[in-house]
Every structure is written in structure tokens, then in C-alpha cells.
């Protein structure tokens, strides 16, 4: 996470006072300040020899409190591309490579002199001065799962007790809600047919920090764990519903953290703030038109191409949600790579570029970071079916907002697009 999403800064002394020893995981903070080792660059916290699994919450809270600050609240929108998008056909075209590698698409200039991306992404190209393309993401495994994008760890990696938490769960636990009427972490993605696309969990952070999943198009259909709003006519009915819910959950051994969950749910269900944020029909028609109309049909065994969810994500962070996650389409194109790209990329281009523009227009670009990526890249060589196969050695990402310095490309691959040649960046970063 970059650009101050975690908003944590510690000095050497603060690290020692908080009892933080041994370093593995870095959570980046604001662009001013010092490293724990005294070097002036990004502020960050390095936590525990076993990552965050070795650090108790009181220590984290003490460390965060000691950092002081009064910093501006940050949010993040993460757009997950299930299946693994083809980096060679998006942000890292290889026009000097052999034909079976370079493919059909041509590069086009962007709003940043000297930076080119695929002709299939003309609207993102016009937003490149507000974006950063990372061409050297590493650390993936050959496994179709959202786990590495949501936690930084492969699904099959060694886990601490409880499992690795999603970054949204970590932020929920460490920072809590900005507003009691809004959950800190909202997942807009549908439950996907390929189960590992849904694999990420709150892990050792606990079930109270699981993403809130609104269902339906807006407040009329909003449910919370099967509790229909229409049945909750008064607070007594609400409490009775939660009592039954607690008994059901207790039978499954998940009571730990339910008090916090109930408090959050009570605030959500007794306020109209969340329902109003989900109801984008009240948005300016020109803004709705900018995002465009999506397609609710499920692609492959993954997600639909719903452009409206990008608008809803913006509305949610504006209303006070810290983390919003979205899944878009299905990118596992072992065949007909270019036919699929011509169907999906124009919609992807419109939705992502509209989000970047909208955040800028509303003055949210310094406080809301956007991260777009999938679980791995694709093979340099196009196969006999006109597709690209799995390639975990390197992949790509697109960043925007978050107060980060944009208008640049980070990292590079070799001449065939198969290996990270410059500035490899791990998913955990």
C-alpha cells in the first residue's frame, strides 16, 4: 500500500517503545518524514518477524498513537481483475519482440511525454498524468485466487493462526470506522463461481473486520447477513434479530468479535447514510454518463462488467468508507485473447478513467488511492489458440490518486515481457 493509505509513521524510539522487533512487513504512510532507520523518504512501519501475525493489537494501537499526527483521512479503492490480465496488451507492449509475442495491438501516446500504453486504453492514456503504471509486479504463484491481491500472500503460503487478513480487514482493525454509520470496509464484488476468487478473509483480524457486502442495486434490497431491513421496524426488532444472529453464529464458533460487528451493524441499519451512498440514481446524470452502463452478465467463472460499481465505490469513500474492493470481468484468456480484449478493455478503460477523473474533479485524488491489478500476468508467447497462458513471474498494476506522484512508469520487463528487469515490486508492497 502506498501514498499514505495506512497513515502510520514511527521513529526508531517509537518502534522500540511499542515493542516492535524483527522486520518483515512494510505499511507505507505519508510522503514526508523518515524511515524507522532514519532515512528520509516514505514513512513506514515494519512489523514483526512473522509479519503482522506476530504483533498484538494493543502494540499496534500504541505504536499508532505514539506516531501523533492529525493526518488527513485516507481511503483506497482496489479493483481486482480476476483471472490475470495480459500486461503485454495493456501497459507494457513489446513492439520490437517477435510477432508471436508482440501481438495485435499498437501503442499510443499518453498525456505523459514518452509514455505509451495500449491503443485499447485511450481514455486511461489521457489520464496518465494522474496515474502510475507498474510494469514489474512480482511475487505471484500460478494459482487463480484473489488472496495475493487482497493479502499480499499466495493462497498456499504458510499462514499464522487464523490466516492472513485482507488489507481491508487490517485497516478496519487498526483504524476503525471514520463514521459509525459507515462500515470501514465494503466489498462490492459478487460471490464468484470459482471459489478461490473469493478466498481472502479477515484472517486473524477477526470476523468483525470482514468486508460489508451490500446486495442489490441500492437501499431497497440491502441486507446484512440475511437480516432484511423491511423486517426491522424498530430497535426492539433489531435487537431480537441480532440475538438470533448471535446464536446462529455462536453455533458455528464465530462469536469472537461479534460485539464490535453488532455495534457497527446497529449504526449502519439505523442510518440512511450507507443506503444513500449505494443509490447512485441521485448522482448528476452527466457523471453517470461519464462512467457508462455496464453489463451484469457474469463473465466466465468470475465477475460481471458493471461500470456503475466504480461510481458506487467513489460514492462510498466520499461518504466515509476507508476501503472499497471491486471485481471486474474475467481475464483468464487462454484462447481468443484479442477478441476478448476488444470486448472487455473498452469498458474497463471507460470505468477506470471515469473514476480517476471523478476523484480529481471532486478533490478526492489526494485522499483516495486507486489500485488496479490481477493475480498474475500472462505468457509472452501467444499460444496456438490465440491466447496467453498463466505467467506468475511478472505482472502489472495501475495506481492513481492517494496523493502519490504520478505521470510515471515504475519498473520494466525484459525485451520479451517475461521477467522483471528493473525495480521489481512485490505484491506485499
Feature map (PLM): residue ranges:
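Ligand-binding pockets and gating/stacking loops
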Residues: 5-9, 13-15, 19-429
Amino acid at each position: 500500500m502506498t501514498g499514505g493509505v495506512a497513515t502510520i509513521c514511527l521513529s526508531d524510539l517509537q518502534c522500540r517503545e511499542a515493542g516492535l522487533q524483527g522486520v518483515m512487513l512494510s505499511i507505507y504512510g505519508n510522503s514526508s518524514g523518515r524511515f524507522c532507520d532514519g532515512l528520509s523518504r516514505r514513512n513506514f512501519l515494519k512489523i514483526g518477524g512473522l509479519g503482522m501475525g506476530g504483533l498484538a493489537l494493543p502494540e499496534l494501537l500504541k505504536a499508532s498513537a505514539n506516531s501523533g499526527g492529525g493526518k488527513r483521512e485516507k481511503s483506497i479503492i482496489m479493483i481486482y481483475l480476476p483471472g490475470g490480465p495480459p500486461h503485454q496488451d495493456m501497459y507494457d507492449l513489446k513492439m520490437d519482440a517477435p510477432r508471436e509475442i508482440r501481438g495485435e495491438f499498437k501503442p499510443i501516446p499518453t498525456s505523459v511525454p514518452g509514455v505509451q500504453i495500449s491503443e485499447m486504453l485511450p481514455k486511461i492514456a489521457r489520464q496518465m498524468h494522474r496515474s502510475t503504471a507498474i510494469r514489474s509486479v512480482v511475487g505471484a504463484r500460478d494459482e487463480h485466487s484473489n488472496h495475493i491481491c487482497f493479502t499480499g500472500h499466495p493462497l498456499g503460503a504458510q499462514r499464522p493462526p487464523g490466516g492472513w487478513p485482507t488489507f481491508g480487514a487490517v485497516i478496519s482493525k487498526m483504524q476503525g470506522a471514520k463514521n459509525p454509520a459507515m462500515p470501514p470496509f465494503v466489498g462490492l464484488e459478487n460471490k464468484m463461481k470459482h471459489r478461490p476468487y473469493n478466498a481472502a478473509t479477515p484472517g486473524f483480524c477477526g470476523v468483525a473486520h470482514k468486508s460489508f457486502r451490500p446486495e442489490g442495486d441500492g437501499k431497497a434490497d440491502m441486507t446484512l447477513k440475511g437480516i432484511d431491513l423491511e423486517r426491522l421496524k424498530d430497535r426492539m426488532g433489531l435487537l431480537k434479530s441480532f440475538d438470533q444472529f448471535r446464536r446462529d453464529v455462536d453455533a458455528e464458533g464465530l462469536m469472537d468479535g461479534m460485539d464490535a460487528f453488532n455495534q457497527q451493524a446497529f449504526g449502519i441499519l439505523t442510518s440512511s447514510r450507507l443506503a444513500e451512498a449505494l443509490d447512485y440514481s441521485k448522482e448528476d446524470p452527466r457523471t453517470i454518463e461519464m462512467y457508462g452502463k455496464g453489463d451484469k452478465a457474469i463473465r466466465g467463472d468470475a465477475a460481471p462488467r458493471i461500470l456503475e460499481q466504480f461510481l458506487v465505490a467513489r460514492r462510498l469513500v466520499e461518504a466515509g468508507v476507508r476501503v472499497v474492493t471491486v471485481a471486474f470481468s474475467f481475464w483468464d484468456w487462454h484462447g481468443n485473447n484479442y477478441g476478448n480484449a476488444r470486448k472487455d478493455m473498452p469498458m474497463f478503460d471507460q470505468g477506470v478513467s471515469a473514476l480517476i477523473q471523478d476523484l480529481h474533479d471532486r478533490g478526492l485524488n489526494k485522499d483516495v488511492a486507486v489500485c488496479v491489478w490481477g493475480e498474475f500476468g500472462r505468457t509472452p508467447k501467444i499460444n496456438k489458440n490465440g491466447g496467453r497462458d498463466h505467467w506468475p513471474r511478472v505482472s502489472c498494476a495501475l495506481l492513481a490518486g492517494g496523493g502519490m506522484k504520478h505521470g510515471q512508469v515504475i519498473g520494466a520487463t525484459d525485451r520479451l515481457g517475461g521477467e522483471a528487469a528493473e525495480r521489481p515490486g512485490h505484491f506485499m508492497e
